[in-house]
Amino acid sequence: MAKQGSKEKKGYPELKEVIKATCKIRVGPGKETLTEGNCLWALKTIDFIFEDLKTEPWTITKMYTVWDRLKGLTPEETSKREFASLQATLACIMCSQMGMKPETVQAAKGIISMKEGLQENKEAKGEKVEQLYPNLEKHREVYPIVNLQAGGRSWKAVESVVFQQLQTVAMQHGLVSEDFERQLAYYATTWTSKDILEVLVMMPGNRAQKELIQGKLNEEAERWVRQNPPGPNVLTVDQIMGVGQTNQQASQANMDQARQICLQWVITALRSVRHMSHRPGNPMLVKQKNTESYEDFIARLLEAIDAEPVMDPIKTYLKVTLSYTNASTDCQKQMDRTLGTRVQQATVEEKMQACRDVGSEGFKMQLLAQALRPQGKAGHKGVNQKCYNCGKPGHLARQCRQGIICHHCGKRGHMQKDCRQKKQQGNNRRGPRVVPSAPPML
């Protein structure tokens, strides 16, 4: 039993490196990462659900098979949260198995969903394309749109190597950096509009920056509508953004202009947000000082946001978000205590009401009192605990004045481990040794 228990403890040795990489993925922006226990829970749960796949090794093919089967299941109302956690954890493991490094669980789910849609489209049309163009494999590259010798075009998903490289650049230099802009402009020349926008959404970056980028894209779309009235040969905003098109349709030659315009809009949005970030008075750089009251900080922040040339929904989002993230540590703690879980969605007025006393003498005295106050039951432990030697409360056994009492024979002057009566008994009453082992999983 002992050997069997130690063998089971190893878990899934073929996924050791995959689980290690998965443990670097965060549950959400700024939140904790997944743990090895989360991964093992997901893998063992899947083994119990699909017993016919339990003996097969954990390859990417098996993971996709499990993913497809999970989509066909309908969990009970009480198990929906656990089922969603199971799918999310599996998506993270699949990304790690493919060598991708998503920053959050949501990004991993987006990657798998995108690849799944691309795979379905590829399987539906793959057989027909291979029959028409038998030499297709000779012309495949890292680009989604492939020109064929026999004429026409074929679409291929963005390579994971390219996606991972863009993700690394975004994490190291920033989403709106010049390095990321150059990399995106280089690879996206042969991407469809849908590919460009989906890759941009799944890149790691500041939420406020992503909202500003989306706002700039909306401004470009509105400008296009004003300058290009509807006509027979005029591209619509939906065509430029790839809305309502299949990947095969978006890869054809008649959509080249739309793809170029979409890429130009994205680059313009990245540059606008980058210039905004480096310009004096940038709202994201307005942070509360140590000696500054929350009201004065909010006044500076709102003035900077109102001066930005962005739409009202973006301004509202920046006010709600930055009024918490750019506040001081004391104000953030006070908002957490007062507003609880809805602190991120609370209005600026509610946050000002919560932080009105931060920095005052009364607030400082309250913090000092909390720091000196005993924490929970631990503060009263020494008062209520009884002495194991004499049985009286108010002191510990090592502080007892009545001397040491043997808990085996009841006499004073020695401890239980030195008791002679205990040594004389030997091991006659000792039973067989019990080896601890993990219980069987039901």
From Swiss-Prot:
UniProt short sequence motif PTAP/PSAP motif, positions renumbered to this chain: 436-439
GO cellular component, one term: viral capsid
GO biological process per UniProt: viral budding via host ESCRT complex; viral translational frameshifting
Start-end of CCHC-type zinc fingers: 385-402, 404-421
SMART domains reported for this sequence: ZnF_C2HC (SM00343)
UniProt keyword Repeat present: yes
Database matches in SUPFAM superfamilies: Retrovirus capsid dimerization domain-like, Retrovirus capsid protein, N-terminal core domain, Retrovirus zinc finger-like domains
Positions of region (Disordered): 420-442
Annotated site, Cleavage, chain positions: 363-364
UniProt keyword annotations, A-Z: Capsid protein, Host-virus interaction, Metal-binding, Repeat, Viral budding, Viral budding via the host ESCRT complexes, Viral release from host cell, Virion, Zinc, Zinc-finger
GO MF entries: nucleic acid binding; zinc ion binding
Family: Belongs to the Ovine/caprine lentivirus group gag polyprotein family.
PANTHER family recorded: ENDOGENOUS RETROVIRUS GROUP K MEMBER 24 GAG POLYPROTEIN-RELATED, IGE-BINDING PROTEIN
Free-text note regarding domains: Late-budding domains (L domains) are short sequence motifs essential for viral particle budding. They recruit proteins of the host ESCRT machinery (Endosomal Sorting Complex Required for Transport) or ESCRT-associated proteins. Nucleocapsid protein p14 contains one L domain: a PTAP/PSAP motif, which interacts with the UEV domain of TSG101.
Protein name per UniProt: Gag polyprotein
Species of provenance: Maedi visna virus (strain 1514 / clone LV1-1KS2)
